[in-house]
Regions:
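Charged, amphipathic alpha-helical linker segments immediately N-terminal to NTP-binding catalytic cores
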Residues: 1-14
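Pre-Walker A adenine-sensing motif
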Residues: 15-32
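Conserved P-loop
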Residues: 33-102
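Short, well-ordered alpha-helix to beta-strand connector turns
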Residues: 34, 61-62, 114, 141, ...
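Short acidic, S/G/P-rich loop/turn micro-motifs used as interaction or catalytic elements
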Residues: 45, 72-73, 101-102, 122-127, ...
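Short, surface-exposed basic-aromatic patches at helix termini and helix-loop junctions that form
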Residues: 57, 82-86, 110-111, 134-141, ...
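Phosphate-binding/switch loop-helix module in NTP-utilizing enzymes
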Residues: 95-147
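Phosphate-binding/switch region of NTP-binding enzymes
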Residues: 137-212
Length: 212
């Protein structure tokens, strides 16, 4: 049977947290260093750029493993690496492709493995919700970021929707903005991926809403 704690006792528990800086600090503020983050959105809205930018911010706090299941080492992925000068991160940012989730899990179980892992994408991981929970439990000492396709405004597929409700942090990407929908919200709750694109997209959306 689990031990009961008072509110005062819970508040004395020290959590290892990360204070994000700059634009990501404005979006998310201070976050737990472990748990699950789900980032989802429609194609062409800046999701890959947002995730890469967040990964670079996390390299200030530890090692990041980017599991490129969907794009592999394609030119589009290379261009995203160049856009955010990921080579500056050196050994703190590493990429792997061509491995299934069992191999990824074994890699994360090794000593001195990455502190943060990006799984791009959840759909290509072929995890169902049960296997997701097992993966999350096995690697509870990591911050796991899942990137997901979208079906409308929801993650694509029943398992991904379940992950959304379970995740500690949820980030919806639309119109070149990453919007915090989870437990951690900074000063603005938003990260602007591409300022001009966001201004044009949200300007049109506001205009269309006003005309309806």
């Amino acid at each position: 049977m689990a031990k009961l704690l008072s509110a005062s006792q819970v508040l004395t528990i020290k959590r290892r947290t990360i204070q994000l800086e700059g634009a990501w600090g404005d979006c998310l503020g201070e976050i737990d260093s472990t748990g699950v983050v789900l980032v989802w959105g429609q194609s062409g809205n800046g999701k890959s750029s947002a995730v890469m930018s967040l990964a670079k911010e996390l390299t200030k706090h530890g090692k990041v493993l980017y599991v490129s299941l969907e794009e592999g080492y394609a030119l589009s992925f290379q261009n995203t690496l160049r856009r955010y000068s990921m080579q500056e991160c050196k050994a703190r940012f590493q990429v792997v492709t061509g491995e299934d989730m069992e191999a990824i899990s074994a890699r994360l179980s090794k000593r001195r493995s990455a502190d943060f892992v990006v799984i791009d994408s959840f759909q290509y991981s072929q995890l169902n919700y049960k296997r997701y929970l097992e993966f999350k439990k096995k690697h509870s000492n990591k911050l796991i970021i899942f990137v997901s396709h979208a079906d409308g405004k929801q993650p694509a597929g029943r398992a991904a929707v379940s992950v959304k409700y379970d995740a500690d942090q949820k980030i919806w990407v639309e119109g070149y903005k990453a919007i915090s929908n989870g437990r951690y919200i900074g000063n603005t709750g938003e990260y602007i991926i591409w300022e001009q694109g966001a201004k044009e997209y949200w300007g049109r959306k506001t205009k269309n809403n006003n005309e309806e």
